[in-house]
Swiss-Prot record:
InterPro entries: MeTrfase_TrmA_AS, NA-bd_OB-fold, SAM-dependent_MTases_sf, Small_mtfrase_dom, U5_MeTrfase_fam. It comes from Bradyrhizobium diazoefficiens (strain JCM 10833 / BCRC 13528 / IAM 13628 / NBRC 14792 / USDA 110). This is Uncharacterized RNA methyltransferase bll2648. The keyword Iron-sulfur applies. Pfam families: MTS.
Length: 415
């Protein structure tokens, strides 16, 4: 059923929000102040509508730069001018903190998209008539939109989509694929690092075919479910003055500019601390840079990432880095273990670090620097620190996921 709505504002998920009859209606790709024609969405989404036409457009509306926008589900916001978009992203942080009763300075949004995303996951699926499609998930669907170029990717990933198509063809033609095929491609110093997931065991002829593709596309490394198929060169990335060899599938900040921005903000807030603890350290984007001036102790549950950090820590000129695997959700560091550190940095995954935040709140650590990719769980954890006696010295929102609702942030707490 077609209806006409007036959009009040853009919500935290990037959808236009129409208010009326006591409920909110969400319309993707609509902007505040617009009058739009919409249709109901099939399925269990009574509060969502499909945008059919914009009758009265916002003066802030701009033309999307990608021909796949609105069909591909990768980007939610290419239709909004930069200035109001930046203000909206900052407002997500301000409003979420306010809901948690946190009143602090929130700096202007820092754009850290840089030259684009350095990692991408492509999906391989069979469509109608058993035709293979490789690309991104469609908006609000598990369908695959076949794509050969994505303008938000780092130019170093220019060959990623062609390589994914070339790998998907032998994987799907020479053996049955019982699960969706996912192909993660990461840009590294020595070429593309590719991990394939969803395929079954690889018979020798298929390994040969995949190795041929890897050579043709000059992949640095090809793995299947993290197991090595072929490596031409070590897939390394630069972190500070150090080259780190990435374990297959290990966490990596989305953009080079994003990592450098977050690391710089962390270092500024750590200040002159001599003993620093890095929690949820990953492969060491913060630890390796902090070790240029301070001794660092680092923990993460990913043993492969910790091993990569330990190897990189041997780089000449760094102060000692002691690192070991530890599940910080099940075994958070307790106040007695925290007492010798001048500063603690923690950068948990999206679920936040509630258990560790409780222990930090009971500690005497002078400075805590929080990095987060989820404003809601950050607000929860920040509330715990504040209730434990810490003051929050301000928040800096960082946008390395441009054209999406996702926003990262860095905050400093002190006693």
């Amino acid at each position: 059923m077609v209806e006409r709505l007036r959009i009040d504002h853009v919500g935290h998920r990037g959808d236009g929000v129409a208010l009326g009859a006591g409920e909110a209606i969400y319309v993707p790709y609509a902007l505040g102040g617009e009058t739009v024609e919409v249709d109901h969405v099939a399925g269990n989404h009574p509060d969502r509508r499909k945008l059919l036409a914009v009758d009265v457009a916002s003066p802030e509306r701009v033309a999307p730069f990608c021909p796949h926008f609105g069909i591909c589900g990768g980007c939610a916001i290419q239709h909004w001018a930069a200035e109001p978009y930046h203000a909206w992203k900052r407002s997500i942080v301000v409003e979420t903190l306010a809901q948690a009763g946190i009143d602090c300075e929130v700096a202007p949004l820092v754009d850290a998209h840089g030259v684009g995303r350095r990692r991408v996951t492509l999906h391989g699926r069979f469509g109608t008539h058993d035709i293979l499609k490789v690309g991104f998930s469609a908006a609000s669907s598990h369908d695959v939109i076949p794509i050969h170029r994505c303008p938000i990717l780092d130019p170093a990933l220019d060959g990623a989509l062609d390589a994914a198509w070339a790998l998907a063809e032998p994987l799907t033609s020479k053996m049955p694929v019982t699960k969706p095929l996912d192909i993660q491609v990461t840009a590294t110093t020595n070429g593309l690092d590719v991990d394939v997931r969803g395929s079954g065991p690889l018979p020798t002829p298929l390994v040969t075919a995949l190795s041929r593709v890897a050579e043709q596309h000059r992949l640095a490394r090809l793995t299947r479910h993290g197991e090595l198929v072929l490596q031409r060169l070590p897939p390394t990335v630069k972190m500070g003055r150090t080259e780190v060899t990435l374990p297959p599938g290990s966490f990596l900040q989305a953009t080079v500019a994003g990592e450098e921005t977050l690391a710089s903000l962390v270092a500024e807030r750590v200040g002159k601390a001599k003993e620093v603890l890095d929690l949820f350290c990953g492969v060491g984007p913060f630890a390796l840079r902090l070790a240029e001036k301070a001794r660092v102790t680092a923990y993460d549950s990913d043993a492969g990432a910790v091993a990569a950090l330990a190897k990189a820590a041997r780089t000449p000129g760094l102060k000692p880095i002691r690192c070991e695997p530890r599940d910080l959700f099940r075994r958070p560091l307790v106040p007695q273990e925290l007492r010798d550190f001048d500063a603690v940095v923690f950068d948990p995954p999206r679920q936040g670090a509630q258990a560790q935040a409780l222990k930090l709140a009971a500690s005497t650590v002078p400075v805590i620097v929080a990095v987060s990719c989820n404003v809601a769980t950050f607000a929860r954890d920040a509330r715990l620190l504040i209730d434990g006696g810490y003051r929050i010295d301000g928040v800096v929102p960082v946008d390395q996921f441009r054209h999406t609702p996702h926003v990262e942030l860095v905050a400093r707490f002190a006693r």
